[in-house]
Structures are given as structure tokens and as C-alpha cells.
Amino acid sequence: MPVYRVFPHGGRLNGTALGRCNKKGATVILPKDRDPRFITIRRGGTLADSDHRLLALWAAACAEHVLHLFESVQPSDPRPRQACEQTRAWARGEITMSQARAAAGAANAAARELSGAARHAAYAAGQAAVVAHVAAHELGAAAYAIKAARAAAPGCEGESAGRLECRWQREQLPDAIRELVLEDQRLRNEICWSVFDC
């Protein structure tokens, strides 16, 4: 089983802090040793460009599904929605990876200004956009979207809302990447706040 590095803000597992934030305060959940299944063939891995694009599109769908939670709090801030749009534009070959990554940074900046569901939804959009740079960020978009759904749920319905969001996400998975993503969820579930227990 791969070893993972985790840098969550406020993240804890069994009472133990999991790590630290990156310089900008955003969570980074990536394998210490990169999984070759999430590295494109041209960079020495096994990921086809077509599957890389599908991962990005799925991540964008996950983020867009909860984006209203951000927009209801910050209706005049377009950065997270633009990140999702840039993700889709990258998948169509209309923009460069660097442009998508810049959109991710803008969405993450929007997230840092907030808390709760709105913050998680904006981070989901940022994670989706950075899939263009590192395919393994696909789980970041999904995990943050689930966290947003949990945070937005009333009372003690958060766990149930998270499971429903997780199931919805899995229904959106294209067949070509389904097993890859489900296996990634199994491997990284614990460091992703165990949100993929659905």
C-alpha cells in the first residue's frame, strides 16, 4: 500500500494531527510516492491523456454539484465557477495546464476567506482545476464536495448528506475511469477524512 503525505488544515485522525497546510493554507492530499496510474504516459506513467481529461471533467462535476453552497454566500465572486469552467476548457484543449492551475489558485483564494460549506465548495473547485496539473487531485475535488454537503446539512444529518453526495459522485463516474477512481478512494479514504465510506 502506498505511503501518503497529508497537509490538512485542522485535520485529525484518532486525535492525532495529520499534518500541516501548504504555504497558502490549502490542504494537499497527494501520495508521497506518486501512483503511476495518475501520471500521464508522456511523463512515464500509465495514464492516457483521454483518461486524464475524464478525471478532470469528473472532478469539475463534483465541484459544480455543490458550487451553489459557495455562490449563496458569495454571489458576486466568480472565481470558483471560473475554475470549474477552466477545468472543462482544459479538458477540451482550449487552455493550457498553467491557465487551469492559475484558476485553481484563484478558487483557493476565494475559499480561504470563508468557512464551512462555502469554503469547502470553493476548495472543491480549486482541486478540480488543478487536476490538469496533477491528476491525483481528482479526489480532492470529490472529498471537498462531500465535506461541503456535510457542512451544509442541518443538525446531525451531515453524515447522511455526505454519503448521498458520495453516491451521486460515483454515479457520475465514466466507465473508463470508474475502477481507477474507486480504487484511489479505497487507498486514500483515511487521509481524505474518511468521506468515501458510502
Model-derived regions, located:
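N-terminal amphipathic/basic-hydrophobic helices that include classical n-h-c signal peptides
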Residues: 1-26
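Structured binding/interaction patches within domain cores
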Residues: 19-175, 196
